[in-house]
Amino acid sequence: LLTCSPGKEVWAQYGHTAIRYYDKESGEDLAINYGIFSLDQTYFIPRFVLGMTDYRMGVQPMDIFLAQYSYEGRGVIEQVLNLSAEDKEVIYEALQENMKPKNVVYRYNYFFDNCTTRARDMLINHLHGKVVYPPAEEDATFRSMIHKWNNKYEWAQFGEDLLLGVNADRKTTKSEQQFLPENLRSDFDKASYNGKPLVKETNVLLAAENKVAEPAFPLSPLSIALIFAAISLVMMLLSYRRQQVYWAWDLALMLTSGLMGIIFFIMIFSQHPCVSLN
């Protein structure tokens, strides 16, 4: 199991998960990645918002995979799994089947079917035994878990909080908590398989660069809200004292609230399970 540290882009703020397949005899060394997408896809942004985005499985040489993450300054941790030859053969055959063109595309879901859960299921679902994980974090919700990772990105957190509904605040199961790469890595590290540790050894393939997250916009959502409230108060007092209607300001208010209403209305039809009930 490969666990990659977070990146700067919004879609990389929570890290990434991949599978490494290494055959010592043949020298074949591959990274299997379930997080391939293209912003050039037709209507990518609207489809992503509505939960209709298709991701795909990708396979590339391990050295190219590492070179990409090295260029981005992101770390990669490898966990070598303690599997039997039979387990490895079954997983290899399952990967070969998954690599067929008819099987590489899947409907992405941020919480329940993403690059991390796909990698986990490919490994765990093809083992000849039971994997035992540590107990689930009792009070963890989807919202609280992502807040741990985007607390330095206030606008990303604000946008997600704006869209996520009540289903994001329910308690989660152990399986659901593994949608985050670091959660899965930690669980694998503490898990047992047929009475033995699931992870045989852990290697740091790339060390993450310690970069301080810089806000994309200098003002926080709270700052903008306070400024907006102050301006609204001033405009209200001016309108009252001068007995004058400021049409431009009223128009801006109506357009802003109207656009927000349209967005919330559209999200009713989103296929994201934690968004529609907002």
Residue ranges of predicted features:
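Extracellular structured ligand-interaction cores
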Residues: 16, 29, 78-80, 116
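Catalytic-site beta-strand/loop segments enriched in glycine and acidic/polar residues
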Residues: 1-2, 95-99
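Short, exposed beta-strand "edge-strand" segments with a Pro/Gly-rich flavor and a Y/T-containing core
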Residues: 76-83, 216-217, 273
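A structural motif
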Residues: 83-96
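Activation targets extended, charge/polar-rich intrinsically disordered C-terminal tails
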Residues: 97-278
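Glycine-rich catalytic cores of cysteine/serine-nucleophile enzymes that process amide/ester linkages
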Residues: 1-73
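Residues in flexible loops and secondary-structure boundaries
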Residues: 9, 40-42, 56, 89-91, ...
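Second-shell loop/turn segments in exported
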Residues: 7-8, 74-82, 101-110
